[in-house]
């Protein structure tokens, strides 16, 4: 295959690149008209279970927007069903779990994952994409143990994580048993994605910002160390860490054996650099800005790129996922602008 665009991998290695790489969290699906047409007929689980469809949705933004990476279209809940979690995606709510974890005996009932047997459709999608179709690296992903555990304990999305924190503080045996279980599930799931052809992995710890630094260090960080070191022990694949509203944890993340630290829109690249972050930085346009007039978007994107170019080792992205209301043409223009502005 000729001229594969490996800008994102080169950036992570600290090599000189022709431009700043760009991709968008939730770029696959969401606002694309082709995707919306599919969603009239199929649910999220329907699409992810059909490799041809899933590969099509994953590739759309690369073809339409010219992004420098593809990100697998699937949900962080994907590995939970096979281990015994009764999860359903309810429209307008998100994942709903009818058998929440309440005790250590509930954790004991969970099984481990065998990705080839349990999620072959995920691996087949990756194989379809990476064999000749894509000219950019494919990002695989997993939810982090805390975020997966919070869904499993709360029974769905939560605003304050009361049940999760109650278990953490009040029943450490169950908490750490669940974390250890999810670490192993996540390692096996990620390693299978890499073996199928994923060239980067993003770990989404979407909700971990709900914890303070002290609790993160004690209840979460050991599991994150195990997870990342477990992946790296098998493959030297770049790992991106991302969570929302977690700027107080940036130094904790910087200690982990990750390669890229994803910033949400609240923390600038220059302030993360001043805090001593030495990883590649990813981000961090406020996704709501994509609904603003173009001159405002361009100005904000330029500010982020200026900070990124001054620092080096920067991947342009949003500070969270694309909203469904965003016009596909806006994402195309942003990608083009990033490429043009940084290649001068």
UniProtKB/Swiss-Prot annotation:
Positions bound to substrate: 26-30, 45, 75, 151, 206, 320
PANTHER family documented for this protein: METHYLTETRAHYDROFOLATE:HOMOCYSTEINE METHYLTRANSFERASE RELATED, UROPORPHYRINOGEN DECARBOXYLASE
Protein name (Swiss-Prot/TrEMBL): Uroporphyrinogen decarboxylase
Gene Ontology biological-process annotations: protoporphyrinogen IX biosynthetic process
GO cellular component, one term: cytosol
Subcellular location: Cytoplasm
Lineage per the UniProt record: Bacteria, Bacillati, Bacillota, Bacilli, Bacillales
Organism the protein comes from: Staphylococcus haemolyticus (strain JCSC1435)
Keyword match Cytoplasm: yes
EC number: 4.1.1.37
Function: Catalyzes the decarboxylation of four acetate groups of uroporphyrinogen-III to yield coproporphyrinogen-III.
Quaternary structure note: Homodimer.
Uppermost EC category: lyase
Source superkingdom: Bacteria
Annotated positions for site Transition state stabilizer: 75
Major site of localization recorded for this protein: cytoplasm
Gene Ontology molecular functions: uroporphyrinogen decarboxylase activity
Catalysed reactions, semicolon-separated: uroporphyrinogen III + 4 H(+) = coproporphyrinogen III + 4 CO2
Similarity comment text for this entry: Belongs to the uroporphyrinogen decarboxylase family.
One Pfam family linked to the record: URO-D
Database matches in InterPro entries: UROD/MetE-like_sf (IPR038071), Uroporphyrinogen_deCO2ase_HemE (IPR006361), Uroporphyrinogen_deCOase (IPR000257)
Pathway membership, UniProt: Porphyrin-containing compound metabolism; protoporphyrin-IX biosynthesis; coproporphyrinogen-III from 5-aminolevulinate: step 4/4
Keywords noted in UniProt: Cytoplasm, Decarboxylase, Lyase, Porphyrin biosynthesis
């Amino acid at each position: 295959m000729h001229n594969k665009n490996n800008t994102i991998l080169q950036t992570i290695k600290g090599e000189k690149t022709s431009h700043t790489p760009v991709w968008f969290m939730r770029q696959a699906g969401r606002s694309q008209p082709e995707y919306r047409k599919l969603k009239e007929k199929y649910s999220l689980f329907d699409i992810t279970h059909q490799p041809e469809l899933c590969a099509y949705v994953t590739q759309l933004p690369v073809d339409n927007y010219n992004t420098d990476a593809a990100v697998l279209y699937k949900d962080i809940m994907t590995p939970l069903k096979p281990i015994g979690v009764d999860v359903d995606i309810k429209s307008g709510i998100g994942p709903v779990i009818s058998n929440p974890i309440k005790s250590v005996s509930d954790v004991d009932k969970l099984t481990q994952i065998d990705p080839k047997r349990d999620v072959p459709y995920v691996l087949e999608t990756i194989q379809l994409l990476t064999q000749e179709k894509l000219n950019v690296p494919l990002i695989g992903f997993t939810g982090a143990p805390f975020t997966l555990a919070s869904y499993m304990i709360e029974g769905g999305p939560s605003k304050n994580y009361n049940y999760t924190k109650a278990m953490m503080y009040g029943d450490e045996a169950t908490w750490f048993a669940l974390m250890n279980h999810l670490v192993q599930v996540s390692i096996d799931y990620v390693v299978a994605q890499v073996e199928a052809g994923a060239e980067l992995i993003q770990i989404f710890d979407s909700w971990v910002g709900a914890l303070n630094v002290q609790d993160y260090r004690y209840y979460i960080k050991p599991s994150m160390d195990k997870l990342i070191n477990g992946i790296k022990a098998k493959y030297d694949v770049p790992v991106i860490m991302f969570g929302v509203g977690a700027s107080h944890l940036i130094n904790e993340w910087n200690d982990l054996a990750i390669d890229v630290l994803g910033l949400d829109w609240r923390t600038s690249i220059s302030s993360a650099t001043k805090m001593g972050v030495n990883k590649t930085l990813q981000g961090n346009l406020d996704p709501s800005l994509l609904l603003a007039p173009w001159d405002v978007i361009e100005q904000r994107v330029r500010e982020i790129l200026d900070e990124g170019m001054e620092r080096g080792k920067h991947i342009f992205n949003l500070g969270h996922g694309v909203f469904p209301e965003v016009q596909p043409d806006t994402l195309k223009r942003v990608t083009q602008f990033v490429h043009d502005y940084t290649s001068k």
